[in-house]
Amino acid sequence: MISLNQVTKQYGQVTVLKNITLSIEEPGIYCLLGRNGAGKTTFLKSIAGYQNITTGTIQVDGKTISTAALDTGVSYIENFAKHFNLPVRKLLQIASEVNPSYDYDFASEMMERFELDGKKKFNHLSLGMKTMVSTIICLASNKNVILLDEPVLGFDAIMRVEFYEMLAESFQKHPRIIIVSTHIISGRCSAKHHKNRKNETEPVAGKQAFYNSENGCHFFAPP
């Protein structure tokens, strides 16, 4: 469960998130939609505990989130994620060693499906392949909350379809809260499930959504 209560985030005089109250109680794949600079990354980093908020509170599974928390129960990956210049297979191995719940079999299966060369160093991969490896590591973490920031960046149309299929398979295997941010509108993020109301929450498809009027950042519950 994720709970945000009157969350505001400011950088100096600039307000990026303003008075957001939101509760996500059920497992599902959720979409965070907004143009570049709308505050999507700030929203996800705040939930993950990667940065402190200005005012308000954020809780995940009843635990208050802050940058001081050692284990938030959240796995977050952003676009342009930077890893050590190590072979891809070594990155998967390290991830499994530091996380007892890590699903190494799932990660290996996805590596094979997307024909990723485990011997190739991460920094030598294309943007799309870097994003795919980062996403696989994130999903295989088996955390209760998965946050994916622009995961389809650098993907062509076919790869986007394959990505969402992988996401659905991961969710079926381990139901949890998965939030995917994007600026690309697709069938997975349909605007018909949301109505705009400035800085308020409202029921959408049995759940809730918000519209951040500061920058135009939309949150969609599953259909």
Question: How would you describe each model-predicted region?
Answer:
Residues 161-173:
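Helical segment within the ABC ATPase nucleotide-binding domain
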Residues 157-159:
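Helix N-cap at the start of a conserved alpha-helix in ABC-type nucleotide-binding domains
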Residues 2, 17-19:
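Conserved structural motif at the start of ABC-family nucleotide-binding domains
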Residues 56-69:
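Conserved ABC transporter NBD signature motif
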Residues 48:
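Helix-to-loop junction immediately C-terminal to a conserved catalytic motif
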Residues 146-150, 155:
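Catalytic Walker B motif of ABC-type/P-loop ATPase nucleotide-binding domains
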Residues 33-35:
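The feature captures the beta-strand-to-loop junction immediately N-terminal to the Walker
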Residues 76-133:
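ABC-family P-loop ATPase nucleotide-binding domains
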